[in-house]
């Protein structure tokens, strides 16, 4: 049977992979969005694990709210990305300096 430590280690590994993905790839906006989503999912795994092992449903309900916000974040982020790609023909982070004043 899987213990709480197994789930916490899995969450920590996924969180570390997302941090490495953010630091190693600062060029592509799509990869940055995927790394942020992976980070949120790692936190959700920890919420569900603690909620299950403590016998409290509040953590599992909180995960549904986090997933809803993450879905909205992804939709808005990809919509902004599509507009930027149509206007600038690139998704490179270094080329997205049009907001500089």
Swiss-Prot record:
UniProt keyword annotations, A-Z: Cell inner membrane, Cell membrane, Membrane, NAD, Quinone, Translocase, Transmembrane, Transmembrane helix, Transport, Ubiquinone
Protein name (Swiss-Prot/TrEMBL): NADH-quinone oxidoreductase subunit K
Gene3D superfamilies linked to this entry: 1.10.287.3510
Entry's transmembrane regions: 4-24, 30-50, 61-81
A GO cellular-component term linked to this record: plasma membrane
Enzyme class: translocase
Function: NDH-1 shuttles electrons from NADH, via FMN and iron-sulfur (Fe-S) centers, to quinones in the respiratory chain. The immediate electron acceptor for the enzyme in this species is believed to be ubiquinone. Couples the redox reaction to proton translocation (for every two electrons transferred, four hydrogen ions are translocated across the cytoplasmic membrane), and thus conserves the redox energy in a proton gradient.
Gene Ontology biological-process entries: ATP synthesis coupled electron transport
Gene: nuoK
GO molecular function: NADH:ubiquinone reductase (non-electrogenic) activity; quinone binding
Assembly description: NDH-1 is composed of 14 different subunits. Subunits NuoA, H, J, K, L, M, N constitute the membrane sector of the complex.
Enzyme Commission numbers on file: 7.1.1.-
Signal peptide region: none
Family to which the UniProt record says this protein belongs: Belongs to the complex I subunit 4L family.
Major localization listed first in the record, in broad terms: membrane
Membrane topology reported for the UniProt record: Multi-pass membrane protein
Locations listed in the record: Cell inner membrane
Catalytic activity: a quinone + NADH + 5 H(+)(in) = a quinol + NAD(+) + 4 H(+)(out)
